[in-house]
């Protein structure tokens, strides 16, 4: 991949081992990009890379419950993140659920791809679209739906 990406890494406590393992499996690729992590997640990835002699550019924010999710969301809003990997613990309640939902919402609103499991993270990081200069992601359409106009647009023009 030629383009240097800005990638956010976030994981709940019960998913931290999973995201570190994913990062190590993708270390060659990730080491070429700028990484942003919530406090503990970013630190764990950085330490795992350092122990293996892998150079990395990782900026650690606060931990999620202390505002790290909100800091990542602010980067998303400013278009300073190209994609996010957020391994969520769906089996246990989180004390900072509002911040989690805010981060997910801002990614959706600002059209920033977010992977919430390993498979989607693998697909995202290996996508050829990152280097396709002709590909321009279309912004989401937030407008009232006009069914009549939509159906008219589908008609074949002769």
Curated annotation (Swiss-Prot):
SMART domains (UniProt xref): MGS
Gene Ontology CC: one annotated term: cytosol
GO molecular function: methylglyoxal synthase activity
Enzyme Commission number(s) from the entry: 4.2.3.3
Coiled-coil regions listed: none
Active site, per annotation: 69
Residues that, per the record, bind substrate: 12, 16, 38-41, 63-64, 96
Known catalytic reactions: dihydroxyacetone phosphate = methylglyoxal + phosphate
Record InterPro entries: Methylgl_synth, MGS-like_dom, MGS-like_dom_sf
Function: Catalyzes the formation of methylglyoxal from dihydroxyacetone phosphate.
UniProt record similarity statement: Belongs to the methylglyoxal synthase family.
Annotated protein name in UniProt: Methylglyoxal synthase
Lineage, highest ranks first: Bacteria, Pseudomonadati, Spirochaetota, Spirochaetia, Spirochaetales
